[in-house]
Amino acid sequence: MKIDIPCPPAEVAHSRTLPGTFYADPVIFEAEKQAIFMKSWHYACHETALAEKGAFVTLQIFDQRVFVVCDRDGQIRAFFNVCPHRGHHLLEGCGQEKMITCHYHGWSFDLTGRLAAARESGEGKKFVGSGLCLKPVQVGFLAGFVFVNLDTGAAPFSNFTAELAASIANVIPDLSGYKVREGTSYFGGDYECNWKVAIDNYLECYHCETAHKSFCDMMDVKRSTFTLHDNFIYQFVPSGGKETSAAYPINLVEDAVDGHFWLLFPNIVFSIFPGTKNFSVSWVEPVSVEMSIRRFVTLTPDNISKEREAARSKWGLSVLNEEDRQICRSVQNGMSQRGFDMGYYLLDSLNGNLSENTVRQFHRMYMRWMFPDAGVRT
């Protein structure tokens, strides 16, 4: 169901930010669900979770349930997690099954989604379900991760992410050797803010020198740069060249020393953080207009120090992530204050990251999805 909301003023995503109401109005949040999240790509799992035939994972995108499964030929497929007979859900959690069986009336489907058996539908019964299939969901792959899209009319994920995939491969060409290790996947915690507050904050390091002291002691944020694309934003933060900092120790010879960060619209982040070699995906999951959850999954190669990786992860979660959570909580409160209407951008024509060009680009992407007739270009 399409929800019509007024297009914001013309200066939005040019000289002014999105209005505060776009972060605090439940009606706008509901409109975003339909215009953005029911049509965009969502993280499902790493492909190693589906390495065995019949292996499956489930996920929920707002009120829509989905499962992803490896069929008997090794192909990864996704379906809406609902039985077409009477609407009961089919699978829970993750696991491995030879058939997909509904525990309401016992209908079963093979791993390609086709109806295999409807209990008691033999001779003498009127049955019109022959040839029935589960409704498929689009699947895409990037950097070993599996993504799904509820919009059957969406362009293939490979088209949407072609430039992004090339950018990641250019930075980390040996990524295929990285795996999800025990202890490297973790939950980032609740963010008491609208999802866009968290993304806005992530996209600029203009606030880093005042809000992230240990990060700035480790990195040379003044030499940060960015590139803007139609569907993603890339940020590069060079190393400060110190093995010892207020954050955690770095081996300048063996470790990843620079920071690389990619945002895929609307809410998926890929990153390489200084320290033991790593590659992460994280996403800001909208829960309500004023609540989000940030989740992380990290890949690492075989030959890393588990102790040093744990130290890097601990700092990221307990220091950097916590600093951002506090910032975002305060900003969310400001979105409904009478003294705030629309914000301003600090822009840099030289693509320096101590600016908010990246935030403006994100707002332009947002406007293009929410108001396609407004003529906003990215």
Features from the language model and the residues they span:
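Short, contiguous pre-domain boundary segments
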Residues: 3-21, 178-180
